[in-house]
Amino acid sequence: MARNIVVEEIVRTPVEKQKVELVERKGIGHPDSIADGIAESISRALSREYMKRYGVILHHNTDQVEVVGGRAYPRFGGGEVVKPIYILLSGRAVELVDQELFPVHEVAIKAAKEYLKKNIRHLDVENHVVIDSRIGQGSVDLVSVFNKAKENPIPLANDTSFGVGFAPLTETERLVYETERLLNGEKFKKELPAVGEDIKVMGLRRGDEIDLTIAAAIVDSEVSGPKEYLEVKEKIAEAVEELAKDITSRKVNIYVNTADDPDSGIFYITVTGTSAEAGDDGSVGRGNRVNGLITPNRHMSMEAAAGKNPVSHVGKIYNILAMFIANDIAKTLPVEEVYVRILSQIGKPIDQPLVASIQVIPKQGHSVKEFEKDAYSIADEWLANITKIQKMILEDKISVF
């Protein structure tokens, strides 16, 4: 059965050639990213436990996680958290299987704690955080759709939704993404442990000049005073400056913690390395898209991919799929830019979307007619192998934020 894949040329100025470009990334310690990370870790933990016990991933969506900021008194040399961060786990998951109670809450809380321990180094999970699981039983309608999908080799979409992907990344997009990855990388943390995980990078390109504004939570116990704090800021800027040389020849201006006012004693220091300790709240889906970026110059889906089940929820699967299709087209065909939009219809096989729209800006001297069939084939092959995405998710080969 032929798939509904439409390839067309669009006329627009590629983002790399536009006068103004905005790009954002919220690092893994940002409250919104913490919510995403916990939601996704719970979904993966539930999926693995369902598979272990029943041989199938049962219905769940754990994409409703709220991080409610606590209260802390940071100070150079080491402060304290006086009110813990409250994390609400919500969503739905099958809890009763053949009259046997499945330990949804235990699995979820364990996954959340393990995620925090692994990713937020200075957070004391037992004392700085309260985790409350309110995950409920799945919707009858959605569960029936999910169960019906078990009888088919290709799962049925449990929602009418769309996913969006684009490629290639611009220099600014790469720089913003790689900046956060560098600063939150294992090597950098060993060299400069004072840098917390709550790192937000905002990129602005005006013509051929890029401004990078970096908000980096500094861990108070790792710096003795203002002098050492300012030295840490300088080292951050120096590291990013070196990174930028490998990505772009454009002029890059780097600004770190611009709200600081040393004369007034104002510095961005934290006890735990995340602003969630001090009243900054977080929610799933309010941060990065599945490619790890927030890109107002591009098409984007508002779907929260983190925490959605990896079997039939197209809000997750189609966003990942669209990104993969776009990447492959950009790597192999003569295009300046490619945008992929995939729309499902609830209850229909996920490999048969209502439409897979592929919009391309051909490189100069090329026409879409030259490679229309090739673009179609790339999308068609990915759709034919769509269940690979579930496997990649459970093997932790894909990040969704």
Curated annotation (Swiss-Prot):
Q: In which pathway does it act?
A: Amino-acid biosynthesis; S-adenosyl-L-methionine biosynthesis; S-adenosyl-L-methionine from L-methionine: step 1/1
Instruction: Write out the catalysed reaction.
Output: L-methionine + ATP + H2O = S-adenosyl-L-methionine + phosphate + diphosphate
Name the domain of life: Archaea
- Residues holding ATP: G136, Q137, G138, S139, V140, D141
GO MF entries: ATP binding; magnesium ion binding; methionine adenosyltransferase activity
**Enzyme Commission code(s) on record:** 2.5.1.6
One GO BP on record is:
one-carbon metabolic process
* Keyword tags: ATP-binding, Magnesium, Nucleotide-binding, One-carbon metabolism, Transferase
**Requisite cofactors:** Mg(2+)
Explain the purpose of this protein: Catalyzes the formation of S-adenosylmethionine from methionine and ATP.
Which PANTHER family did the record assign?
Answer: S-ADENOSYLMETHIONINE SYNTHASE (PTHR36697:SF1)
Q: Which family does it belong to?
A: Belongs to the AdoMet synthase 2 family.
Q: What is this protein called?
A: S-adenosylmethionine synthase
Q: Which organism is it from?
A: Pyrococcus abyssi (strain GE5 / Orsay)
